Amino acid sequence: MRKLLVYMKDYKKESFLAPLFKLLEATFELIVPLVIAQIIDVGIQTGNTGFIISRCLLLVGFGVVGMISAITAQYFAAKAAVGFATGLRHSLFQKINELSFSLLDRVGTSTLLTRITNDVNQVQNGVNLVLRLFMRSPFIVFGACVMAFTIDPGSALLFLIVVALLSVVVFGIMLLTIKRYKAIQNQLDSVLNTTRENLNGARVIRAFCGEDTETEKFIGQNSLLSKLQKSTGRISALLNPVTFILINVGITLLIHYGAVQVNTGILTQGQVVALYNYMSQILVELIKLANLIITVTKSFASAARIRDVLELDTNTVYSDDKKIYNTHAVEFDRVSMHYNEGAKDALENISFTAEPGEIIGVIGGTGSGKTTLVGLIPRFYDASSGTIRVDGRNVNSYSLEELREKVHVVLQRAVLFRGTLRENLLWGNKNANDEEMQAAVKAAQAADFVQSKGGLDMKITAEGRNLSGGQRQRLSIARALVGNPAILILDDSASALDYVTEKALRGALSALPNKPTVFIVSQRTSSLRHADKILVLDNGALVGCGTHDALLENCSVYREIYDSQFGGKEAAAK
């Protein structure tokens, strides 16, 4: 939690004034029982109406000043807590945007979503309550004990015993629950992950009648969450009844002791009432303090989870080797890659070159490493061994910004953002003019439907839900083309296009004036047969590299893929 306090640095004044005004309010509260004692012992005993009225007005004044102090404290506490949470949320969001693909895979989007929403809210609530109660409640408990000593030391000893017992209960429950709250948050991540997975795959689940299976899976996750919450709740639920029992026993003993002291003339009735009020104040404040500790316990658990994300190592490793070794657009030299330490290589000993302006096809079975291979070029992931060069230079010697200006990628899942088409295309080149954007739209074979929907000002809903799959893919390609990249990667990003549109797209890519090197990842040999070079992957190994005709002759994996799509040798002969 201490590491997160840096986000309070802009709210030092509010963090000082909030507890200060709460202490002012508490001071007036501690004086009230003494005034009431005076009303009983002086005003009522002597029948002095003027004294009673003056002291009642004094109580009203204390109440008004206390209320103003409380409102002011609440304002400063809320301002500091909201500002703290806003800064923390900004840093967390920025950190998430800096995470590499491998870290995103490892942590999980559902977990990150929980951290930036629920966990930040928990910490915000904790900060708010701490600023308002952390000093006020102990101050009143301590002050009430001191006041009790000034009235009667014997009664004050009873106060100290009750406070000591309550402290054991409160801190004992806190220690028992703090780890449980962290477990609850982790299980909540699992529930959210299951929910997210089901929502994203709803159509597939229903297509295969998997609702019952997925429901059972969710019930299992949710039941575990419920079990953790109930076990923690049972412990937390002991807090209020145990504190009430201890306080009420203390009050009972106090009243009995006070009655004896009044009968012997040691204490007055007003003093006993004052002692009772101080005991009641201790009760109220200890309950507040107990609830504060529960909230702070949750906040500490959430703060630890937030800190784990903020401390993730996102430092990209760069190479000092900026030497240009050759004129190849892309070169892989004995490249291997695995996603996790100790895991099997997703790619193993890959070597090939791509020349400027070439169209390179990448094909292979499911899980063969196609997406992994092209993802290494813009450094979505880093190679475990070997060297990758872009324009003859080690890819690790480029800054990510410089590299990704050269390399534009269209991913398997076409992602568009809410706004206009123009706003989406500017992601590819923030300085692009309308003419350049229209040229990119035309090259992506999207001009017809874009024109019919309002041109560059056409509205796009979140994730492009108002467009078909093929339309989203074409606009994603247009966005990549706007930047005039030196290297364009199409990762199975034309799968939703019909053959006619796909053929027109291939022709447009070949005719681009800047002649980029194009990598086309596809499952369809028809999409790659005109490529200058085709890379054939099988279980992470490069088993073939050449033209379509050459691979049909000498690569059994490619031949098998081709035959499965076109019916064997007869189709090949044609």
For the regions a protein language model found, what residue spans apply to each?
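ABC-type nucleotide-binding domain
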Residues: 324-574
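Cytosolic ends of transmembrane helices, especially the final helix of ABC transmembrane type-1 domains
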Residues: 196-200, 206, 210, 234, ...
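Hydrophobic alpha-helical segments in the permease module
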Residues: 59-70, 163-167, 236-250, 256, ...
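Juxtamembrane helix-loop junctions of ABC transporter transmembrane domains
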Residues: 20-21, 25-37, 41, 53, ...
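Membrane-integrated ABC transporters
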Residues: 1-29, 36, 44-58, 73-77, ...
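Transmembrane helices of ABC transporter permease
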Residues: 10, 14-27, 59-62, 68, ...
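Short intracellular "coupling" helices and adjacent cytoplasmic loop segments at the cytosolic face
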Residues: 46-47, 82, 90-114, 118-120, ...
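An intracellular "coupling" helix at the cytosolic face of ABC transporter transmembrane type-1 domains
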Residues: 9-13, 101-102, 118-131, 135, ...
